């Protein structure tokens, strides 16, 4: 019995199988950890909507924020186009600092947590490695009352003004200035290192207001407040 043809067929099948397994799968799952800076502008126009007085100034300060994502990526090896989508946790934060010529100062710090979805189109100019991403994300606000307040308004030199306590002012802000869901467009640059690691630098700009002003008796007005996030992250990707 001639077994040579059978051995040849078996060897061919093994060779084809080895080639199939060696091919790079276009689907990958990834875990991303990162941090960045965030700011929300327009809060000053909520608190002081008109020129009631002068000799004061506001300043918006960026705040550190974390981000975590679980995502899926599709990119055929050698292709210019890829896509990415997943679930993310992120924060939007900012700090508004007030000072005036009476030496009154306060800090208002909104910090909101979000869980949502993201989708990005990725362009690989050199077909691998470096990529440009364009897309957006949308998420639910987990802590709509996530605003804090600090001030020296309880100092004796302001006794004649009969200011509310710091605790009461913060309570009112939590009640009347509520955090909203986040819908943002964004994009950035990334670089994939080998088969498993990736670095990304991305920017997101909020399309809707971060804070909604509820009806109140404190002259706080409704005004658009758009958040911005800059995030640097590292990812680990798993082949499927």
Write out the residue ranges for each language-model feature.
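Outer-membrane beta-barrel "beta-signal"
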Residues: 226-240
